[in-house]
Amino acid sequence: DVHPTHYGRICPIETPEGPNIGLISSLACYARINEYGFIESPYKKVEDGRVVGHYRIVKVGDTDFSLNEIVEKKELEKANRKVAKAKGKGQPAEAEPYSFYLSAWDEEKYVIAQANAVTDDEGNLVHERVIARQAGETIQIEREKVDFIDVSPKQLVSVAASLIPFLENDDANRALMGSNMQRQGVPLLRTESPLVGTGMESTVARDSGATVVCKRGGVVDLVDSNRIIVRVEAEDLQTGQMKEFGADIYQLTKFRRSNQNTSITQKPIVREGQRVTKGQVLADGPCTEAGELALGRNVLVAFMPWRGYNFEDAILVSEKLVKEDYYTSIHIEEFEIEARDTKLGPEEITRDIPNVSESALRDLDESGIIRIGATVKQGDILVGKVTPKGETQLTPEEKLLRAIFGEKAGDVRDASLKTPPGIEGTVVDVKIFSRKGVEKDLRAKAIEETEIERMNRNIQDEIRIINEARNKKIAEVLSGEKMQRDVVDFKSGETLVKKGEKVDRETIGKLSRRELLALPVSEDAREEVRTLIEQSENRIKVLEQKAEERREDLEKGDELPPGVIKMIKVYVAMKRKLSVGDKMAGRHGNKGVISRILPEEDMPYLPDGTPVEIVLNPLGVPSRMNVGQILETHLGWAARSLGLHFATPVFDGALEDEIHSQLEAANLPVNGKSILYDGMTGEPFEQQVTVGYIYMLKLSHLVDDKIHARSIGPYSLITQQPLGGKAQFGGQRFGEMEVWALEAYGAAYTLQELLTVKSDDVEGRSKIYESIVKGEVPDDPGLPESFNVLVRELQSLCLDVELLKE
């Protein structure tokens, strides 16, 4: 249950729906855990009805403050004004806003006002009496008696709930579903941030670690699909601190499998030559666009029934969403195979598999492992493996012949890794792990070489940038120095700089270390040049040392479980387009399953001829009380027409009047409705329909992962009945109540088949095939194996049951 002390500490909305409801909770947005393990929530101080802004001093500058001192805003401004007026260049103090964190016990003693209490420019509370909390009770109280005020209206809820626009207009149960379902959103091929957000999107994207964030400011030196190199600029560093020179290399993740089998891919959003600052987003992650969270797509929605296809939360979508890859996602499956050391001898990863045609091996390399880029479907071999099989005892003569002629094929069987049913895609990656001390195969060596090559390329780039930065610095040091004699190239003997001239950066780049140290300049300048050269060389030495360690790590074998010689992982990527049966949802708990994908020309269309992209049932709104989706739809329509993105923060969002004014500004109907025309007949519908843009997500409950069919497959050892579940390639359970249904229908033979030949009548199920092929009437069913199991169980109780024939 929700307790008053949860306020600002534990989110009352985000919790699972099942048996764990209320047992698993999330921290609220601003909550933190103190040194004793208790949750604290931040508040701003209120004195005599005025909100006092406090700041913590981060840099003292030339003020009288001490570091980390807590001061009022007016004191800080006064001190900084004083420094600015003083003669010379005084450094003002730098500070960050400070809040007072209170635990639940501390909070009981104070009167705390709500964040949306009206204040003037000075921070004074406008109303005589304000709504506040005291000892867990909500009261109205004089403004002078207020001690603290909330930091923000979204202090109450967690991060997931704070991403729902118009949360205040949604019922709590649906908000709970909305915050939980955002976690199930599938990363799409083409991301798009929401037209109507809450302002938290960029914060969440940055803090999630999905994006690549700039560590140190500088200029982008190189960008490609795999890495971003930022040349750290000297302006950001203290002068002469060579250790800070050089480059930051950001390696981007490409097509990595997540735990949900979705694809983690990062793509750069900066250009070469662009100046970047610390904390700036350099590359988008799997669910972000331009550094903002982007879990779904904005689609044009109409709230209306359409020929029964959106009955009971079903969703009707336009073919345009499939054609233009709106909801196409990439999924990556991992398949693993181990070669073990068995009692009969070691298993072997090989291309040489008995009784397999050459066409089935066409995509395997000489090591027996599939090549990257191969297209695979059900039953294709991914990794060839043979395992020794226990032979019947050989006579000594046969053993001798085997030893002489190397007749091997007879004593191994095929145990290859094959593509399971329902998988069709492209091999994107292969990983090979070999035991220490075991000779690596050609493929493993090739993978290792590629990795070392990539590492070397990164190091060469870093060394290049360090040397360029060093040369730039040396040029600055020598900018005021004239050469005391001619500078001659040691090798060729040509004069590079004449006496009395200055040396430029280009010439410095041509000079060797020895020549740089011998430049005819003043002693001070030469000493500075020597220091810079030594610092850069030390930096390069450290880089090369790290690379050498990494190389040794790569060349060493891997730690594998006992008995495993080699382990191979193959990653297959699949493109999944939107299909009937996929689950979709908005951010307000408005979830549904796609019932039909309709041609664009048949969808209802607006008066200007624009067909809608998705049709939702209006009956899904009133009883569920998630009206936020309707307000989002209205504001989204205005946003798309105006070419803007709106942020409506939780509990502080856009009001109805503000939505009206935005719709007016966009020259759209103020009521958010429009006459629609039937795409099939061209006739207008009777009434106006609510139309607009809504943000919809595709959830990771995809029909392709769930659909399953079985004809003949594995059986349980004891009962001889088919196994259950998709993972075991099992059948569907035909339970007690399903039997009643068939009995009620009088479908006697169907029922008999289900209970015998389709289940555990071992003899009958092998004979039925024969009779179907020959077109004969099948024999009477035999005895189900489960009856034999029952007899055995009774025998274990010392009850002998015999089957007597008449």
Where are these regions (language model features)?
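Intrinsically disordered, low-complexity regulatory segments
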Residues: 1-806
